[in-house]
Amino acid sequence: MAIPQIKTQVGTSKQAGDAAEESALRHLQQAGLRLLQRNYRTPGRGGGEIDLIMRAPDGTTVFVEVRQRANASHGGAAASISVTKQRRIIFAARHYLMRLREPPPCRFDVVTLECGVIQWLQAAFEAC
């Protein structure tokens, strides 16, 4: 008896996420930001990840979370960034900044992609 194979969307979801990140990167670069690092992760379990770390023309370090949704149901892409997710991003940002001799001014931006439309939310949340 043949066992039916179950198709997962892991590869498809990962590819869609990578494509969204690439679109966000191009959008930010066209706006004058420069890429410092991609997919920065803190070591160990329970840490955080930052999709893109950019430098704005004024010298501000910009930590960017990229979110993509096929449609705006369940609140859309921006609404999917929970307080817990924000804390993890802030944790990773602090970890990144500790490596620098003199930390620059920074902010947390979100780039959403919904139905092919890019929206850039500058200073979307703050580190308390």
From Swiss-Prot:
Residues 1-20 are annotated as: Disordered. One of its GO terms (molecular function) is nucleic acid binding. It holds the Pfam family UPF0102. Residues 1-15 have a biased composition (Polar residues). Disulfide bonds: none annotated. NCBIfam families: PRK12497.1-3 (NF009150), YraN family protein (TIGR00252). Belongs to the UPF0102 family. HAMAP family: UPF0102. This is UPF0102 protein Rfer_3873. It comes from Albidiferax ferrireducens (strain ATCC BAA-621 / DSM 15236 / T118).
